């Protein structure tokens, strides 16, 4: 390993000599000596002798390398305690340099499995797992001092059988996972929510149509405005209205092509599909009326970034639709109207904001991949560290 290469990857040392073979050995010594005692701060130090410390370093041109550091042990004449000099890029008690450990962490984070990485680096699988856990824990500790984000998305995702659910807290403004906590009820999340810093600074919280999460937010985030997630509201309307169509015309259960036409937005149909849909609706006028309501309601729910003056007309239209659904003769429409009435304030707020839990759902997909890579590991703390490291 050349002096320039060592200075680029591990600065702070002077090369004494190096031996080039299958294993490249580089003999170095630290440039800076300690100036004071780490225990008492005294400046009267005495050298007690030298010793060699061997650490693994990054490979050079395909050859593994080892750095042999000539270290000194010092004694403080003020307090009488002895200590070893700190080494740049090498933590106490470690047998490898920080650049090498970070390289192993990044390669494992990129998808190289533990067994393959251990074989390539001539390490044990336990060592690779320990290095990865140390770096992820270091990243997770940085979150302890962070305040809650101003725009927060809360949703649940499933885990293994022994621990069925976990709650995800997503920073929608910065598009990253803030934290995850086991459980989804207020009793399970109470201790975690009590430890959060800056809960009073949260301005907006986006959730699905969950009564338990709404009650939880009103208690623990009193200054936050609750916004309904647009995807879940539109899906709720689609499910109930299409259920009416299936009850009116039971043949839709096996005529999936017609059901797909009813499910698709009208402006996304090609001319052939639109002609087929018109012919079907002409034969089924009841389904035609339900389809027209579905189109108008979904178009209203998909409106974004409106000011408060523009929202006034939209509110009148929404209330008219809700009243029409609640007075309908179909039980599914009545259920939908009651749900929209109970969540009308949260639904109206989503017209003012463009952020939604689609960001959180995307991270849930990535978290499923993390669970597959860590298959068999049931420790939630380990899973949380991996999620924060890769999604935070």
Describe the residue ranges of each PLM region:
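Short, positively charged, Gly/Tyr-enriched micro-motifs
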Residues: 54-163, 199-202, 347-348
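Acidic/histidine-rich catalytic cores and adjacent linkers
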Residues: 30, 34, 39, 46, ...
């Amino acid at each position: 390993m050349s002096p320039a290469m060592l200075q680029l990857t591990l600065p702070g040392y002077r090369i004494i000599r190096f031996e080039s073979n299958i294993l490249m050995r580089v003999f170095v010594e630290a440039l800076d000596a300690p100036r004071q005692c780490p225990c008492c701060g005294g400046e009267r130090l005495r050298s007690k002798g030298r010793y060699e410390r061997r650490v693994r370093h990054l490979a050079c041109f395909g050859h593994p390398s080892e750095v042999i550091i000539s270290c000194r042990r010092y004694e403080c004449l003020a307090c009488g305690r002895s200590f070893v000099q700190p080494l740049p890029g090498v933590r106490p008690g470690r047998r490898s340099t920080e650049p090498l450990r970070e390289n192993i962490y990044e390669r494992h984070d990129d998808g190289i499995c533990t067994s393959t990485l251990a074989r390539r680096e001539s390490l044990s699988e336990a060592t690779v797992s320990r290095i990865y856990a140390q770096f992820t824990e270091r990243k997770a500790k940085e979150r302890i001092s962070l305040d809650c984000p101003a725009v927060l998305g809360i949703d649940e995702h499933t885990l293994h059988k022994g621990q069925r659910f976990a709650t995800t807290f997503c920073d929608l403004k910065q598009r990253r996972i803030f934290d995850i906590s086991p459980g989804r009820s207020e009793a399970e999340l109470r201790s975690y929510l009590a430890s959060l810093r800056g809960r009073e600074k949260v301005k907006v919280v986006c959730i699905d149509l969950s009564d338990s999460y709404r009650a939880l937010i009103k208690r623990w985030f009193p200054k936050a405005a609750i916004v309904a997630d647009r995807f879940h509201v539109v899906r709720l309307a689609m499910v109930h209205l299409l259920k009416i169509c299936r009850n009116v015309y039971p043949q839709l259960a096996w005529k999936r092509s017609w059901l797909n036409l009813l499910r698709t937005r009208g402006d996304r149909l090609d001319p052939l599909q639109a002609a087929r849909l018109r012919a079907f609706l002409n034969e089924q006028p009841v389904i035609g009326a339900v389809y027209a309501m579905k189109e108008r309601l979904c178009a209203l729910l998909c409106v974004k970034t409106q000011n408060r003056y523009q929202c006034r007309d939209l509110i009148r239209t929404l209330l008219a639709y809700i009243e029409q659904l609640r007075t309908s003769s179909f039980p599914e429409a009545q259920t939908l109207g009651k749900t929209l009435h109970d969540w009308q304030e949260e639904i109206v707020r989503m017209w003012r904001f463009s952020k939604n839990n689609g960001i959180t759902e995307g991270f849930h997909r990535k978290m499923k991949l993390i669970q597959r890579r860590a298959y068999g590991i049931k420790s939630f703390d380990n899973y949380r560290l991996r999620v924060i490291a890769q999604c935070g």
